[in-house]
């Protein structure tokens, strides 16, 4: 698969599903540190803002999920129950529930308000590494070191489908905005798009030199896929054509599965953690690095963007163990 930038590199990419596109914001972002959240006792693995914008969930190698206030970083509650470290956490669309993926080979479904574990999803034969809800939040998807992707029914906790997805650990799984498609990425170097209903593989995106795919995510409107590979590269794909549209570089990512994100509340940015302890922000259109956020003292494994405010949460590994909230005026 050609990885050259196809077509007009200056083509404006609309990410939002809304018809009324906001005009490009000309100024670069000016994110500044708002607060540092201390609570985890080992490496933080994932941070996610709730869809309603109220909360931030963090997961950690300390086997805990902590819920914080999204705006002030105030500690809310801790969710206990996993026997081994947690790699990922994700919110339901109504912000009432969370799902977590753990090295104990299970996923757990949590009630946000009570902090109670509602269900434990068992079936993977190795570490569960990544998880997400579909938009109606009646299904959960998970990826594992057992090289499969599983689709679970939230109501019953039963596994509905197992996709023999990859030939190496699955690093990331995500539904598109309609819930009709699933994207998965793997250390086997492949990014695959699946029909969520049938479990059929519709398309495979592959790079020339096949570096491990460490992260994948659909854009908010579902037209594009953002991939991260362990050769210090992020790429934006038009998956319907199987073409790479944009390449983002300058950060360091050769070892860890670092979360990346679309930031659409102000300007249109790509945001990622990095192994040089920084958060990188690129202009989505021009691919230029517009800001680097300095403050963490270890690899920034996860960066999340707030759904409505110009707010970024970042989290770092075991020499740091903290979460930082950053805010921008635009």
UniProtKB/Swiss-Prot annotation:
Q: How does it assemble?
A: Probable part of a cullin-RING E3 protein ligase complex containing CUL4B-DDB1 and a substrate-recruiting component (DCAF). Interacts with CUL4B and DDB1.
Listed as disulfide-bonded, the cysteine pairs are none
Sequence motif DDB1-binding motif, residues:
188-192
Please tell me whether the keyword DNA-binding is annotated for this protein: no
Q: Which GO terms describe its molecular function?
A: histone binding
Fetch the SMART domains from UniProt.
Answer: WD40
Could you tell me what this protein is called? Answer: WD repeat-containing protein 5B
Spell out the InterPro entries in the cross-references: G-protein_beta_WD-40_rep, WD40/YVTN_repeat-like_dom_sf, WD40_repeat_CS, WD40_repeat_dom_sf, WD40_rpt
Question: What are the record's GO terms for cellular component?
Answer: Set1C/COMPASS complex
Composition bias type Low complexity, residue spans = 9-23
Q: Known SUPFAM superfamilies for this protein?
A: WD40 repeat-like (SSF50978)
By sequence similarity, the record places it as follows: Belongs to the WD repeat WDR5/wds family.
Q: Where is this region: Disordered?
A: 1-26
WD repeat intervals: 39-78, 81-122, 124-164, 165-204, 208-249, 252-292, 295-330
Q: Keywords, A to Z? A: Repeat, Ubl conjugation pathway, WD repeat
- Biological role stated in the UniProt entry: May function as a substrate receptor for CUL4-DDB1 ubiquitin E3 ligase complex.
């Amino acid at each position: 698969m050609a990885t050259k930038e196809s077509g007009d590199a200056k083509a404006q990419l609309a990410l939002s599903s809304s018809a009324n596109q906001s005009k490009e914001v000309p100024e670069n972002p000016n994110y500044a540190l708002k607060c540092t959240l201390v609570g985890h006792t080992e490496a933080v693995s994932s941070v996610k803002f709730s869809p309603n914008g109220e909360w931030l969930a963090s997961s950690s190698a300390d086997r805990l999920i902590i819920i914080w206030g999204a705006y002030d970083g105030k500690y809310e509650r801790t969710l206990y129950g996993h026997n081994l470290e947690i790699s990922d956490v994700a919110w339901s669309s109504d912000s009432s529930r969370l799902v977590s993926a753990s090295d104990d080979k299970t996923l757990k479904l949590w009630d946000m308000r009570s902090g109670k574990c509602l269900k434990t999803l068992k079936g993977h034969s190795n570490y569960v590494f990544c998880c997400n809800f579909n938009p109606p939040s009646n299904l959960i998807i998970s990826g594992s070191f057992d090289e499969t992707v599983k689709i679970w029914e939230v109501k019953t906790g039963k596994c509905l489908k197992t996709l023999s997805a990859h030939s190496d650990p699955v690093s990331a799984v995500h539904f598109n905005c309609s819930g009709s498609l699933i994207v998965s990425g793997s250390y086997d170097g492949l990014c695959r798009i699946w029909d969520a209903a049938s479990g059929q593989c519709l398309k495979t995106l592959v790079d020339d030199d096949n570096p491990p795919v460490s992260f994948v995510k659909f854009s908010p409107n579902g037209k594009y896929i953002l991939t991260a590979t362990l050769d210090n590269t992020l790429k934006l794909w038009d998956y319907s054509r199987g073409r790479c549209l944009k390449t983002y570089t300058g950060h360091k990512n050769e070892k860890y599965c670092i979360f990346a994100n679309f930031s659409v509340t102000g300007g249109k940015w790509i945001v990622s953690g990095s192994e040089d302890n920084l958060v990188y922000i690129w202009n989505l259109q021009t691919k230029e690095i517009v800001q680097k956020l300095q403050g963490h003292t270890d690899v920034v494994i996860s960066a999340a963007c707030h759904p409505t405010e110009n707010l970024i949460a970042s989290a770092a590994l075991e020499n740091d163990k903290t979460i930082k909230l950053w805010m921008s005026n635009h």
